[in-house]
Amino acid sequence: MDSTQLARGIVRELLELGISDVVLSPGSRNAPLSVALYEVAKKGFIDLHVRIDERGAAFFALGLAKASDNYVAVVCTSGTAAANYHPAVLEAHHAHNKLLVITADRPARLRGTGANQTTNQVNIYGDVKSHDVAAPIAIAPLLAGGPVHLNVQFDEPLLPTDTNDWLDGLEIEMAADLPELEGELHVSEGTVVIIGHDRGTFEADLIIDALLAADLPVIAEDPLSFPGAIPHAALFLADEKVREKLRPTTAVVIGRTTLSRSINALIASAEKIV
């Protein structure tokens, strides 16, 4: 399969998964993806955000993923471009954000030969799940809530030689529903709820309904992810005297708390952590 067909297959997968935002850092080796993405953007199937600087592009995509709680794809060319995505991918990994990183690569046969802009990009992001792709691949089974890396091998020629309407017969596949909260929330006096960045993959509305019924104080490590939380909690909890006065008997933690030392200190001070 040539590079044009491979790129079109990947982009079609993105559309069928319902991914609506793609951030593109254009380059030479990812030209097949750039052309395919432009074609679907022109038809209104995606919002294509072009960002030349790779580091900024990756963080922009991360922001979109956090705000939408949906997978956002970010696409770059080979070599050092892929390395410039690493800071944002690392943050997405620890916060469990939905980032689909697609890096273009030379064919595997050129690795270790000194070819221009060629390095070992497989597993370049450490513990993030990485898939070396030389043929069409089903992306849906790979998406488990955190960042995923597709390293796609493109051989020359990199530009399309046909004008086929490859978007005919497109079917949009709805994303799987997030888990629901089951049962009632029974709490005692002195209970506080702390919500991490990913909300434990639960929908915000489900958490809000449960907490309103229980009438509990709520602290969110990322205030943007939960508007009903106590504002500026991380700031006033930095005062040890305030933290001691507010020490909970039970801390109910939903999701992962990774950034705020003061909030983690409050959790650690609780008599019981759930």
Regions found by a protein language model. Name each.
Residues 23-26, 101-104, 217-222, 273-274:
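Short internal beta-strands
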Residues 8-19, 64-69, 139-144, 182-191, ...:
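Glycine-rich phosphate/diphosphate-binding loops that line cofactor/substrate pockets in enzymes
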Residues 70, 105-109, 113-147:
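Conserved thiamine diphosphate
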Residues 28, 106, 152-158, 197-199, ...:
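Glycine-rich beta-alpha junction loops
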Residues 32-108, 259:
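Thiamine diphosphate
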Residues 75-77, 98-105, 149-153, 194-196, ...:
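Short beta-strand segments
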Residues 45, 140-188:
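Conformationally flexible catalytic loops at phosphate/diphosphate-handling active centers
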